[in-house]
A protein has these predicted regions:
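An N-terminal amphipathic alpha-helical segment
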Residues: 1-57
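Short, compact, well-ordered microdomains
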Residues: 61-97
Length: 97
């Protein structure tokens, strides 16, 4: 028997799990910036992983869109002066302290 409500619930759970992965990747970006700033650097690169072992698979393009939105927010609030994206998956950050 077809149970559309169950399918919808599973899809929502999948999207929620994927968003958690996006948040983990964004936290890694922030950690990378903080570590490099502590080392006295004013720039860093971050390679967005196309997959993470032991994590749910996620749509890579959706992840990049999520990260772009979050990065735009920190650009407004923090001292990030330059953000560049290099295809297929590399972010370049430069900041002014």
């Amino acid at each position: 028997m077809l149970n559309l409500s169950l399918i919808k619930i599973k899809q929502e759970q999948l999207k929620y799990s994927q968003k958690l992965v996006y948040k983990k990747i964004f936290a890694q970006i922030c950690q990378t910036i903080n570590i490099n700033a502590d080392l006295g650097k004013n720039y860093c690169l971050f390679v967005v992983p196309e997959f993470i072992l032991d994590e749910i698979t996620y749509p890579f393009i959706d992840c990049l869109e999520y990260l772009n939105k979050k990065i735009e927010k920190i650009k407004k609030d923090k001292n990030i002066v330059e953000v560049s994206f290099f295809v297929p998956n590399v972010f370049y950050f430069k900041w002014d302290i």
